[in-house]
C-alpha cells in the first residue's frame, strides 16, 4: 500500500522538583562508609547495630560535612554568628535557618532623613 509506520522512543527528564525531592530523600538516608585498613572501600558495619547492604541507588559518604553554623578557621568558615537574618524570608537567610536554632536578637531601627520641612 506504500504506507510506512515509524515509531520513535525517547526519555524525558522528570520535573526539577521531583528530582530535587528524590535527592533530598536519598541525602537524608545516606550511609557513612568507613574504609578498612586494607583500603577495599567496603562498608565497616561495626558501628551499625544491624547490617544493611547499600543499594545501587543509595548515596554514600566517607566523611561528615563540617558544621557551617560554627566558626572553623581551618576550613575558612566564619560561621553564622553576627550575620543579619530576615525574619520574614522563606529562604536561607531566614533567622531560624541562618541562626541554626540558637535564637536571634531583634534590632528595630527608625531611619531619620533630612528634609526641607518648615513648621
UniProtKB/Swiss-Prot annotation:
Keyword ATP-binding set for record: no
Gene3D superfamilies xref list: 3.30.2460.20
PANTHER family attached to this UniProt entry: PROTEIN WNT-10A (PTHR12027:SF89), WNT RELATED (PTHR12027)
Function: Ligand for members of the frizzled family of seven transmembrane receptors. Required for normal tooth development. Regulates the expression of genes involved in tooth development.
Residue numbers with lipid attached (O-palmitoleoyl serine): 1
Primary localisation category: secreted
Glycosylation sites: 86
Keywords linked to the UniProt accession: Developmental protein, Disulfide bond, Extracellular matrix, Glycoprotein, Lipoprotein, Secreted, Wnt signaling pathway
Heme in keyword set: no
InterPro entries for this protein: Wnt, Wnt_C
SS bonds (residue pairs): 85-100
Species this protein is from: Plethodon jordani (Red-cheeked salamander)
Domain of life: Eukaryota
Record's protein name: Protein Wnt-10a
Subcellular location: Secreted, Extracellular space, Extracellular matrix; Secreted
Post-translational modification: Palmitoleoylation is required for efficient binding to frizzled receptors. Depalmitoleoylation leads to Wnt signaling pathway inhibition.
CC annotations in GO: extracellular space
Alphabetized GO MF terms: cytokine activity; frizzled binding
GO biological process: canonical Wnt signaling pathway; cell fate commitment; neuron differentiation
Family: Belongs to the Wnt family.
